[in-house]
Amino acid sequence: MGGFLRGSPEPGPAGGSGGSAGGRLALLWIVPLTLSGLLGVAWGASSLGAHHIHHFHGSSKHHSVPIAIYRSPASLRGGHAGTTYIFSKGGGQITYTWPPNDRPSTRADRLAIGFSTVQKEAVLVRVDSSTGLGDYLELHIHQGKIGVKFNVGTDDIAIEEINAIINDGKYHVVRFTRSGGNATLQVDNWPVIERYPAGNNDNERLAIARQRIPYRLGRVVDEWLLDKGRQLTIFNSQATIKIGGKERGHPFQGQLSGLYYNGLKVLNMAAENDANIVIEGNVRLVGEVPSSMTTESTATAMQSEMSTSVMETTTTLATSTARRGKAPTKEPIGQTTDDILVASAECPSDDEDIDPCEPSSGGLANPTRAGGGREYPGSSEVIRESSSTTGMVVGIVAAAALCILILLYAMYKYRNRDEGSYHVDESRNYISNSAQSNGAVIKEKQPNSAKSSNKNKKNKDKEYYV
């Protein structure tokens, strides 16, 4: 029993060493799992983040710098951001009409739209005031150049981008702003064009008028001129927004995307069947197929459209099979739309009684092209979605491989551990485990122990007497 008590402290360090080894092994398990999880999440997040980045290639003048797309507003996350309509041969029109008691009068306007066409003459968008007022704003293509013409009570004011070629069938973005009689126009990434009409200052008009006004009528005329000067900077009682230009004699043929005007996303509203919008003529929402038409007739119609001057920048399965000369299948036609940026609108600040407006923000979409060729809006979105999924899968596989390598290394290191720490002193009498668990064996050993002790006592007695 004494041998057992003396030998019992020895296994203690071995057990403690085993516990620390187990802790180290657990630590080696936790660290790679944590790192692998972070690696997988980071890889997947970077791939998903790349989905929202638009890369632009091409000439130094067209789309050389990416423009940020603001996705934060809830209105852009409603599922219709970048709604695209195709205006086919023969023309069509989308008309939005303000309710009679809700027609705005604005000192500043913002217009943004994406389009593609090959026409040299066309009217894209026109905003008109109520009958009898004569105020209007028109976005048009004249001799292959994009321009805007408007009138808010004086003469027609025109602004045009003469350097950019926009009737090349490629996707372009135009942004227009108006503040009183002043205006700016930008196409894609070309420099902003500014227009400041002469005599737009109230003080200049007053100085000219005072020279011919009798002194006794000066105060009354001054007040009238001031009021008239303010009125000549306001777009009064806006009534309708007409998209497509069918009524103007130059119907637009091509694609229009994500129209934004002073907070209104008219194409989005048209896709949602807004009660204030009327669609007429050959106008089709991208991805929409009339229920009365079969897949074969739809493919034939698309093929005939592509043979005309209308450059439809949308790709569908039926169109692609028709181009290859194969028989169209019964597979559904997929919808591919591009994101559209929306320029923010500012509410006019005026002392007059103007209907309140609510500013909104957003962004306008830029085209994506590769190698100088024409890439249809929306096709790159599918590629980015698949690449994001691939990146996430690769990240998970890499993390799993890292875990396996670390596990194999740990198993190799701790499989043949040195057992030198378990020293057994042969000179000491250790009782085996079977002796600890079997009481009968211990009792059998007791007589022998008693005899050995008596023998030692006798030897001591002998030594004492000697």
From Swiss-Prot:
It is found in: Membrane. Residues 412-466 are cytoplasmic. SUPFAM superfamilies: Concanavalin A-like lectins/glucanases. One of its GO terms (biological process) is cell adhesion. InterPro entries: ConA-like_dom_sf, Laminin_G, Neurexin-like, Neurexin-related_CASP, Syndecan/Neurexin_dom. Residues 85-283 form the Laminin G-like domain. Keywords: Angiogenesis, Cell adhesion, Membrane, Signal, Transmembrane, Transmembrane helix. Residues 45-390 are extracellular. It is a single-pass type I membrane protein. The chain crosses the membrane at residues 391-411. Brain and arteries (at protein level). Residues 1-44 form the signal peptide. The keyword Glycoprotein does not apply. Residues 347-383, 433-466 are annotated as: Disordered. GO terms for cellular component: membrane. Belongs to the neurexin family. Neuronal cell surface protein that may be involved in cell recognition and cell adhesion by forming intracellular junctions through binding to neuroligins. May play a role in formation or maintenance of synaptic junctions. May mediate intracellular signaling. Plays a role in angiogenesis. This is Neurexin-1-beta. It comes from Gallus gallus. The gene is NRXN1.
